[in-house]
């Protein structure tokens, strides 16, 4: 027994190493595409449909992009399919058309001309086939229990066509042999279809048809109709650095970015609204009181008038007293720029740093009406730059040579009307945003210059 003890310790150690290696594979997501990693991924899964493999896969990619390139921990096979870029688009499979003889269809019209396709992958599910077993028809392929693992050949065919045409171009044809030794492979398989997607975009045929057929050794062929496949396209968008790119891509497909006025019907126009009463003090530079003396009729705004009462008719003396009280009340509602108010404002300004500096600003997408289609993040720290760049400017403000000369000329006063240099962002960082496009497909984009890191005088 003592002689077997070292071998027992060695066997336990090997088992422990194997378990650690298996756990590392699970963390990398090699055994299941839909498994998320990290607390951030689990927090965002609540915003995605349950069992949605496409969204779960995109959420994992978002978590890797946000963490600053988690691809170094991935296997070589995934690193080859994840080239550097700023855009990842997912395309869900739609049910095919019998007339077009396609099991599934992909609508790739969301791809823009500014997006240079770097890579594209087709993901399809074979879990039920890999996990199934059947009575072995030939003893040569049987195990000791009389069962055999499935051995078959996959035929993947991709067509490209317009929405109103039959399949016109067979852009890809794949033949994949699945042997018994591949049973323990991932349930979701993927295939590189970069050239196929590029050809479809080149032909101007942004609709792909996809067929998946399986053939067993006895030459029996069946069509696979299980979990729907999906396509991931990795691209580099050259227009993402252009002005207002975040508005055109994030907000453009939905509704125009503008204040939505209240659409009044004829009946609503005749009804008095409190919201219009609240706007008057803003126009007249008056402080809103507990009660409003404004009213709206069908013709528009009426002039200010005293409150109505149910008392008897007053004499002239009472009317004069009432006018005095009314005047004092009106005077108290008007903004007074007296010495006390100005001192309070100056004291508030003195408490804030006057020189150019980075100030805190948190942007919540719900406040600007974008939370409906932005999956993550719900908010982010944007910051902003504010403050004076007066002469002499300290080195901490990192003024440019031009800003230094401009501040000197302004201080000397030789040339009138020269403004002081501006406090602007010096360094900015990017932000990864996961959102839904106009076709309800999940898109990941990395937008540059979204968060201010430091400020300077320019």
Swiss-Prot record:
MF terms in GO: cytokine activity; growth factor activity; morphogen activity
GO cellular component: extracellular space
Listed Basic residues bias regions: 320-329
Matching CDD domains: TGF_beta_BMP3
Highest rank taxon of the organism: Eukaryota
SS bond list: 356-423, 385-455, 389-457
PROSITE patterns hit by this protein: TGF_BETA_1, TGF_BETA_2
Entry protein name: Bone morphogenetic protein 3
Native source organism of the sequence: Xenopus laevis (African clawed frog)
Annotated gene: bmp3
């Amino acid at each position: 027994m003592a002689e077997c003890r070292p071998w027992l310790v060695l066997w336990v150690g090997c088992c422990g190493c194997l378990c650690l290696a298996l756990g590392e594979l699970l963390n990398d997501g090699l055994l299941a595409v839909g498994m998320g990693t990290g607390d951030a991924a689990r927090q965002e899964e609540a915003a995605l449909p349950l069992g949605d493999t496409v969204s779960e896969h995109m959420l994992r990619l978002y978590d890797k992009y946000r963490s600053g390139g988690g691809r170094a921990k991935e296997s070589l096979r995934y690193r080859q399919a994840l080239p550097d870029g700023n855009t990842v688009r997912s395309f869900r499979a739609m049910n095919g058309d019998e007339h077009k003889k396609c099991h599934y269809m992909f609508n790739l019209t969301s791809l823009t001309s500014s997006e240079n396709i770097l890579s594209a992958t087709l993901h399809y599910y074979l879990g039920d086939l890999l996990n199934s077993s059947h009575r072995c028809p030939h003893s040569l392929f049987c195990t000791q229990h009389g069962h055999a693992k499935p051995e078959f050949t996959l035929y993947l065919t991709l067509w490209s066509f317009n929405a109103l045409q039959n399949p016109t171009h067979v852009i890809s044809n794949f033949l994949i042999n699945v042997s018994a030794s591949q049973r323990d492979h991932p349930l979701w398989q993927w295939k590189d279809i970069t050239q196929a997607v590029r050809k479809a975009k080149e032909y101007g045929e942004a609709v792909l048809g996809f067929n998946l057929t399986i053939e067993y050794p006895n030459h029996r062929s069946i069509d696979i109709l299980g979990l729907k496949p999906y396509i991931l396209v990795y691209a580099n968008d050259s227009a993402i650095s252009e002005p207002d790119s975040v508005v055109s891509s994030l907000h453009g497909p939905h509704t125009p970015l503008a204040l939505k006025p209240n659409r009044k019907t004829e009946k609503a126009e005749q009804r008095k609204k409190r919201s219009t009463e609240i706007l008057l003090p803003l126009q007249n530079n008056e402080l809103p009181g507990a009660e409003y003396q404004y009213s709206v009729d069908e013709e528009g705004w009426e002039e200010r008038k005293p409150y109505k009462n149910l008392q008897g008719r007053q004499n002239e003396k009472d009317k004069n007293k009432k006018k005095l009280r009314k005047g004092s009340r009106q005077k108290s509602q008007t903004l007074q720029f007296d010495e006390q108010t100005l001192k309070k404002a100056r004291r508030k300004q003195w408490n804030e740093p006057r020189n150019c500096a980075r100030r805190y600003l948190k942007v919540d997408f719900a406040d600007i009406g974008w939370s409906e289609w932005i999956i993550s993040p719900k908010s982010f720290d944007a910051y902003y730059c504010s403050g004076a760049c007066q002469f002499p400017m300290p080195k901490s403000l990192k003024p440019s040579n031009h800003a230094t000369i401009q501040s000197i000329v302004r201080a000397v006063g030789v040339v009138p009307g020269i403004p002081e240099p501006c406090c602007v962002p010096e360094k900015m960082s990017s932000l990864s945003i996961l959102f839904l496009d106009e076709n309800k497909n999940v898109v990941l984009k990395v937008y540059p210059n979204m968060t201010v890191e430091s400020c300077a005088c320019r």
